[in-house]
Amino acid sequence: MDKLNFLIIVAPKNNGDKTIKKLGKLINYPSVSRGRGTAPNSALATLGIGEPEKDVIFCFALKDDVEKIYDILYNKLGFIQKHLGIALTVPVSAVGGRLTYDLLSGDKTDLRTHKKGWFNV
């Protein structure tokens, strides 16, 4: 189960849906929330952070796809430039069982017919 990663992507305000669309099938179960920093505007300008409001994307991806995801973020969405975004991954070493792992990693198996020997609905 160590091949699954939880991604947190901080994108420019109103770019969450665009980011999700660009990443396409490389990510699973994306969710966008609005985020707002707490630093005063003068500190933001000094640090080169830009606007305090951002889109925060939470999603899952397979470890083998993380490099492709970063490539899209940096080269196609411009995250390499100041003010445009940041991303990080956290390995998911344990989840609530094999079925949960399969679902989060993109297995679209119908739960009612899921019969791999360890879970039946």
Predicted regions and their residues:
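Positively charged, small/polar-rich N-terminal and surface patches that mediate targeting and assembly
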Residues: 1-121
